[in-house]
Amino acid sequence: MNCACVDIGTNTTRLLVAERDDGRLREVVAVRRFLRLVPDAGGQIPPDAVAALAAIVAAHARMAQQYGVSDVHVVGTAAIRAASNRDELCAAVHSACGIPVEILSGEQEAELAFTGALATLATPPAGAIGVIDVGGGSCELVTGTVADGVTWWRSMPIGSGTLAARHLRSDPPELAELAEARAEIDVALEGVDPPATELVLAVGGSATTLAAAGGGELEPASIARILAVLLAEPAAEAAKRLGLHVERVRLLPAGLLALEAAWGAFGQAPLQVARGGLREGVVMRAFGGRS
């Protein structure tokens, strides 16, 4: 039996159709559409973005149904949590596809990211595991174990889209703008002290893009190397060089800064990109897994 999740993020709206295989998830299809949900001065997502989002979610739901899915879960994260017109937005999506939108709290987002990260590991370690989820609107840090689930978490408003909108005004970003973004990240992480872990799993677009663009290397030097490329030329040129979507490239410097700082909060324990994250966690929950 297949199950599907549509994840409405700050930068992208993603569909995952998956099946459960011996307690693990197997991806059937995954699709993403870039759509920035940027609030206006009054905190509202503009009407044109709401209409575009409703159309995207409806298209994702139709695709899921083509794969035999009747159980489609639509979830919203930081951008919708913070929007002053979230009720109208959710109503528009519901009207377009007939599926209610579940607005996740920061705690739920952290728990589901942890569940999803573990769901795609062939052999999860028995000891403490950390998870870093750098999204578009927020960043979650989580620790826990396979046996006990989440034992500690924090959610902070330092997602890649949020940081880029506030600080990265130039193309390519200037060093002074990166310093501004890093200063905000440092303030958000002040006093954040995760329990010790033997492994840290990174989920979210910034992490997977780093792994792809960096040739799979996950170390501080790989972050610095990719940042150097992103600062050397406009986003359109860097996108061609790295083989990435230009909108992803525009947000990547901020996401990498947040990932690097969050990794530092864990003492830079070994870092591995996990194939699963929030969407996989939602599907696991639907299948009767943790969270």
Residue positions per predicted region:
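N-terminal glycine-rich anion-binding loops that anchor highly charged ligand groups
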Residues: 24-32, 67
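N-terminal basic/disordered segments at the start of proteins
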Residues: 1-26
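A short acidic Gly-Thr/Ser loop motif
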Residues: 7-12, 132-138, 203-206, 277
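Broad gene-expression machinery/nucleic-acid interaction feature
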Residues: 12, 30-32, 129, 136-138, ...
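Flexible N-lobe loop architecture of eukaryotic-like protein kinase catalytic domains
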Residues: 70
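Helical "lid/coupling" subdomains associated with nucleotide-phosphate turnover
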Residues: 3, 17-20, 38-66, 79-128, ...
